Structure formats: structure tokens, C-alpha cells
């Protein structure tokens, strides 16, 4: 469970409320609806979010910028100890976008500042060819401060998010309980390719394993 400093007691109170509520809500769609209803209050709390980002700049212990994340612009704000949900902050430079990727859980995205663009895709192939994926763009949405959007797990949630404008934008995301998969798929729609993206620690272990295999070390 993420420990927040006393100076962010207001944020801790939000997460405590979310935890108590989600423990009582069993259905995925109901949890998504609850999260979408709750998020604007946090997204529009500029004073609190400025405090969080100021603490990042000052090198405070929270948020812990040393914590391993899938993307370099990702900051972990909270992970529930029962994995009911996690909360993450993303900061996008002008023109910066994530790779096209899927997710291992449902999620709700929200815009904190400027504009966030979310591009959704549908997978068109039958998934029988390793490394091959044919995608079709299904829609684009533009989020402004306080707006939210939903992403669903696996093929139902293939998307990319980013900053279409000048100036740095900030996005807040809440993710539900993940399925037991150690990677996410990342896609290259122009080349019809798909590959697995692993968390940094696991990615390093896999690289070391591959190196040992190349060196003839088989029994690990």
C-alpha cells in the first residue's frame, strides 16, 4: 500500500474514500461508473495537483520517482494493498504520445491540464500469426480539464494517449484490478506489428536470460 505524507492528507482522504467504496462495489462496470463520477473532483483540484508536482520537482519521497513504471512519463500516486485499483499521473511534453498499446485492466483517464488526446483502435486480424496485428482506428476523443474517458482490458482497450498541442499536459489515470499477465502488447499500426512490453525489472531479467543463453548457459 502506498504511504502518503501527512502534508497530502487531503489526497489520502480521497483514496481512503475510494477504497471503502470500491470494496462494496463488485461489478466492473459499476466500479468504472463510480470512478468516472469521482474523478472530476480530483482532476479540477489544481492546488492539490500543483502540490504533488512541486514535490516531484523538489525530490520529495512522494511520489517516489525511483519506482519502476512501464512508461518514462508515469508517476505512481497510489496502489491499493488489495490491488483494487491504482492511481497514476502522466506528464506529456508537446507532441508526445504513448505507443499504441492495450491494458491488463479497466481504466479511467482524466485530463488535469491543457488537452489530452485518446485514439482508440480495433484489432482486425485473427491473432494466429505471431508478431502480426492489423489495427483500424475506431475513434478519437479530446479531453479537457475535468473530462474523463474509459479504457477496457486487452483487445477492447487498444489505444494511445498523448499531447496534441503546445505546452505540457497532465493526465491522471485510475486502473482496476489487473489480470495475471506480466506484459502489455504494444502495436505498430503502420507496419502491422505487435510486440510485448514488459515492466523495467522484468525486461532486464529477460535481457540477462537471453544473454546467458547466447553464452551457452542453459541451466538457470
Segments predicted by a language model, with ranges:
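A short hydrophobic beta-strand segment most commonly corresponding to one strand
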Residues: 108-110, 166-181
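A short glycine-rich, His/Asp/Glu-containing loop-to-beta-strand
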Residues: 68-94
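Conserved short histidine dyad/triad with adjacent acidic residue
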Residues: 88-102, 152-156
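N-terminal leader/capping segments at the start of a protein or of a new domain
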Residues: 1-57
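Glycine- and acidic-residue-biased ligand/ion/polar-headgroup-sensing regions
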Residues: 105-124
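Long hydrophobic alpha-helical segments typical of transmembrane helices together
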Residues: 187-220
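Asparagine-centered strand-capping/turn motif at beta-strand->loop junctions
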Residues: 160-165
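Short acidic-glycine-tyrosine-enriched beta hairpin
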Residues: 122-158, 197-201
Amino acid at each position: 500500500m502506498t504511504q502518503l505524507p501527512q502534508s497530502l492528507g487531503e489526497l489520502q482522504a480521497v483514496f481512503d474514500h475510494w477504497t471503502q467504496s470500491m470494496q462494496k462495489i463488485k461489478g466492473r462496470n459499476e466500479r468504472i461508473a463510480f470512478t468516472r463520477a469521482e474523478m472530476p473532483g480530483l482532476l479540477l483540484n489544481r492546488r492539490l495537483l500543483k502540490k504533488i508536482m512541486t514535490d516531484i520537482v523538489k525530490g520529495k519521497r512522494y511520489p517516489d520517482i525511483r519506482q519502476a513504471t512501464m512508461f518514462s512519463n508515469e508517476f505512481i500516486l497510489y496502489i491499493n494493498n488489495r490491488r483494487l485499483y491504482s492511481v497514476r499521473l502522466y506528464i506529456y511534453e508537446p507532441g508526445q504520445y504513448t505507443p499504441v498499446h492495450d491494458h491488463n485492466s479497466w481504466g479511467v483517464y482524466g485530463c488535469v491540464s491543457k488537452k489530452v488526446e485518446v485514439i482508440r483502435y480495433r484489432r482486425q486480424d485473427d491473432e494466429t500469426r505471431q508478431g502480426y496485428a492489423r489495427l483500424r482506428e475506431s475513434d478519437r476523443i479530446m479531453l479537457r480539464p475535468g473530462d474523463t474517458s474509459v479504457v477496457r482490458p486487452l483487445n477492447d482497450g487498444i489505444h494511445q494517449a498523448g499531447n496534441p498541442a503546445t505546452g505540457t499536459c497532465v493526465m491522471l489515470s485510475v486502473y482496476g484490478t489487473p489480470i495475471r499477465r506480466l506484459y502489455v502488447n504494444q502495436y505498430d499500426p503502420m507496419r502491422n506489428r505487435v510486440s510485448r512490453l514488459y515492466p523495467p525489472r522484468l525486461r532486464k531479467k529477460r535481457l540477462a536470460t537471453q544473454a546467458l543463453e547466447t553464452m551457452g548457459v542453459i541451466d538457470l
